[in-house]
A protein has these predicted regions:
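SAM-dependent methyltransferase
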Residues: 145-211
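A conserved beta-strand element that flanks and buttresses the S-adenosyl-L-methionine
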Residues: 111
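Conserved class I S-adenosyl-L-methionine
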Residues: 1-47
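A short glycine-rich, Lys/Arg-flanked "PGG" loop and its adjoining helix->strand segment in the class I
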Residues: 125-137
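Class I SAM-dependent methyltransferase SAM/SAH-binding core
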Residues: 49-50, 55-100
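C-terminal lobe and adjacent flexible extensions of AdoMet/dcAdoMet transferase-like proteins
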Residues: 207-243
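Conserved beta-strand signature within the Rossmann-like core of class I S-adenosyl-L-methionine
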Residues: 138-145
């Protein structure tokens, strides 16, 4: 199992807060109609728990299983769950990775944000098969599309800039094609003092297998749709696979 996030985990909440503000509303709109009587809702790749909170709010009666393989991220996730009485009652945190995740016998829905591209196409096909065997007809698998449907060069760009106390944090990200459907993304966090002096940089890279919702639907043998707006506002693309 590869831990993609421990190197930069200290900064993750800065990204997650913004991410959930834009992706939370469309995710909520998809989940609100889900019948949760069939089994738990599964979140694969729970991160620090921001999306978990969205799921719990949209489905106030649902049992939720959250899998997060990174120990550093899982520590923040467990802390978030433990301090909220409602989450503490309904959410089970596990350390499983998508490729070999133990699954309950039945599920009502699945959420995968920031995960699908870490899997190769054969790994995804195997996962879709296991999930489909546990979902009822009409149940959704909600997947974040990430906006990269095929390999391409993405010059480094500053994607976020936030100030905390006397320091400003910049997040830079870029990518380039490697082999087949894969890209290598490189991220750099810069920590700057008030005078603009860089006091620290933390860089990391990972391989991402590109896809679009049509490809995921073909892999899974399911129907699909894209969510591109919520409440009349453009949002990051979300794919919904329906058994």
């Amino acid at each position: 199992m590869i831990d993609y996030y421990s190197t930069s985990a200290e900064f993750y909440e800065l990204v997650a807060t913004r991410h959930t503000a834009s992706s939370g509303p469309p995710l909520s709109s998809v989940l609100r109609g889900v019948d949760t009587s069939h089994g738990p809702v599964l979140e694969i790749g729970g991160g620090t728990g921001r999306v978990t909170e969205v799921i719990a709010s949209a489905l106030p009666q649902a049992e939720i299983i959250v899998a997060e393989p990174s120990a550093t991220m899982r520590a923040m996730l467990t802390s978030r769950v433990a301090r909220d009485p409602d989450l503490r009652r309904r959410v089970t945190v596990t350390d499983g990775a998508a490729q070999d995740l133990p699954l309950p016998d039945t599920l009502s829905a699945v959420v995968m944000f920031g995960v699908a591209g870490h899997l190769t196409a054969p790994e995804r096909v195997a996962l879709w098969k296991r999930l489909a065997a546990r979902l009822p007809d009409g149940a959704p698998i909600v997947v974040e599309l990430m906006g990269v449907s095929s390999p391409r060069v993405i010059p480094p760009v500053m994607s976020l800039r936030e100030t905390i106390g006397r320091q400003t944090y910049e997040w830079w990200i870029g990518g380039e094609p490697t082999e087949g459907d894969a890209m290598r993304f490189t991220t750099t966090w810069k920590v700057l003092r008030e005078d603009g002096r860089t006091v620290r940089e933390v860089s990391d890279s990972y391989v991402w297998h590109t896809f679009d919702v049509a490809r995921l639907a073909a892999e899974a043998g399911m129907t699909s749709r894209r969510i591109t707006e919520a409440g009349g506002r453009a949002v990051p693309e979300i794919g919904v696979l329906v058994k």
